[in-house]
Amino acid sequence: MAQTQYYGTGRRKSAIARVYTRTGTGQIRINDKSLEEYFGRKTDRMIVMQALEAVEMTDKLDVNVKVIGGGPSGQAGAIRHGLARALIELDEAMRPVLRKAGYVTRDAREVERKKVGLHKARRRPQYSKR
């Protein structure tokens, strides 16, 4: 008999993560690599683990993730968001805990576009009085 699998989609900046969870031993696979293999920075690994640690499920679930787009920081945030959604699908009672920690809300901050006549999004050319 097949195990029950729970799914959640997470987004952050331009990264999109599809997160699948099932009961297991706490193994995390991201694009067919281990968590340590995929994320070199400790901060990114911590961000991914935050949602599981908030509900104390670190060694009770196996997590399989497919993530595309963005950079390491955005991908870590997308995985955390997707994981929070998958955990809510698993047990609705986890929602208040995850909501209080801020993992359910999609971080809507995106890169501001560069404007014509400016160096960057807001950086103006140097002003010369004479």
UniProtKB/Swiss-Prot annotation:
Pfam families: Ribosomal_S9. GO terms for molecular function: RNA binding; structural constituent of ribosome. The keyword Ribosomal protein applies. SUPFAM superfamilies: Ribosomal protein S5 domain 2-like. GO terms for cellular component: cytosolic small ribosomal subunit. Gene3D superfamilies: 3.30.230.10. The keyword rRNA-binding does not apply. Keywords: Ribonucleoprotein, Ribosomal protein. GO terms for biological process: translation. Transmembrane segments: none annotated. It comes from the Bacteria. Belongs to the universal ribosomal protein uS9 family. This is Small ribosomal subunit protein uS9. It comes from Methylococcus capsulatus (strain ATCC 33009 / NCIMB 11132 / Bath).
